[in-house]
Amino acid sequence: VTVTIANGTAIGGSAFGATKHINTQVGGATHGFFQVDNMSALGAYTLPMGNGTLYLPITLTPATLSSFSVGVFTGITEDGLPNGTAFTAGKKAGVVDAVWTINRNSGTSCDMTLDWPASLEGATFATYTNAQIGISHWDNPNWGTSVGTGDNTLNTATRSGVSVFSPFGVGKTPYVLPIKFNYLNAAKGNGY
């Protein structure tokens, strides 16, 4: 099921939230989508998405005139699909328990911001600093590295310059890569 806004008009109204949003979560393998065509370049479009009880908006800022179809469901899965194998409790502890599917119909790249309620944060995720939060893309056959910036108070994550689309999730950004030293020379100096 897809609902389409053909003229790129921003969604009007106010007070979007848990009780007022576009519900794209459906049962089984079916996935609901909300499509917005003719989105102007560099205009931020907030799409008031959710699952019927939780508000999970998506903000897209396209680089060029674009069209996107978006949907969201709760219950993150191994393959980013609504009927996929659920993450184990251990894996869910470090992520937001939701999947945002963003498909580009036309255009090039965009910046994206994903929002979520604290109730979807895993126990470990809730302890992450802002610098440790990013957006991960389903890279088939696995979830890719989480990159971008986050805010664990406002419960948002942003990823810039996205040009490959499909399912996205929110998790921990990678650690600094370890360095292997082949040679290290140190000396005592300055009285220390």
Stretch-by-stretch model annotation:
Residues P141-A157:
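Short, surface-exposed terminal/edge motifs of secreted or surface/virion proteins that either
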Residues G134-S136, L154-N155, Y183:
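Functionally constrained cores in energy, signaling, and assembly domains
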Residues V1-S146, S163-Y175:
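Self-processing/autoproteolytic domain segments and adjacent N-terminal interaction modules in large
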Residues S136, G148-G150, A186:
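Small-side-chain structural scaffolding
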Residues G169-N190:
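Residue-level detector of functionally pivotal "anchor" positions at catalytic/ligand-binding pockets or at interdomain
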Residues R159-G161:
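Short, flexible loop/turn segments at beta-strand junctions in immunoglobulin-like
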Residues L154-T156, G189-Y192:
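Solvent-exposed, conformationally flexible loop/turn segments
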